[in-house]
Curated annotation (Swiss-Prot):
This is Antitoxin Xre. The gene is xre. Homodimer. Forms a complex with cognate toxin Rse. The keyword Hydrolase does not apply. One of its GO terms (molecular function) is DNA binding. Belongs to the MbcA/ParS/Xre antitoxin family. InterPro entries: Antitox_Xre (IPR011979), Xre-like_HTH (IPR046847), Xre/MbcA/ParS-like_toxin-bd (IPR024467). Antitoxin component of a type II toxin-antitoxin (TA) system. Neutralizes the activity of cognate toxin Res. Keywords: Toxin-antitoxin system. The keyword Nucleotidyltransferase does not apply.
Length: 148
């Protein structure tokens, strides 16, 4: 019997790579969150998704004044704000996967009220971890054909 030797996953998901984040999970992401993401990540998400920056900030619960302050101070978000951004990207990435890589359909779906979410749009629930988990749970059910 051969011994199992795990190798670290090196493949970074396309969305995470496109917006300049080092990894979609693992200790590299944890370290990046602790250090604080660059404020430029909001611009990168905006360019990738064509979502207005104000909508990204609303969905992440980060006031626009905080973004302005961070830009003039040290150019980095706090770890808490970085965690919120990672949550947004994680859910957006799952939505893009749900739609077979079609980010246009995923973005439209994210802003559409969904019966399975109490007639709320997925992006309106991302400000809290519990809301994001509900969205990810729904995505998982849709991927596996479980509609209850």
């Amino acid at each position: 019997m051969r011994a199992y030797h795990p190798t670290p996953a090196t493949k970074t998901r396309a969305l995470w790579r496109e917006i300049g984040l080092p990894a979609s999970r693992g200790t590299v992401l944890v370290d990046s969150i602790k250090m604080g993401f660059s404020v430029d990540v909001i611009d990168s998400i905006h360019l990738w998704a064509s979502i207005p920056k104000a909508e990204i900030l609303r969905a992440t619960g980060i006031p626009s004044r905080s973004l302005t302050r961070r830009r003039t101070h040290d150019g980095r978000f706090t770890p808490e704000e970085s965690e919120r951004i990672a949550r947004f990207v994680r859910v957006m990435d799952a939505a893009v996967d749900l739609f077979g890589g079609d980010k246009g359909k995923a973005i439209t779906w994210m802003s559409t009220p969904i019966k399975g979410l109490g007639h709320r749009s997925p992006d309106s629930l991302l400000e809290t971890e519990t809301g994001a988990l509900e969205v990810c749970d729904l995505i998982g059910r849709l991927e596996h054909g479980v509609f209850s």
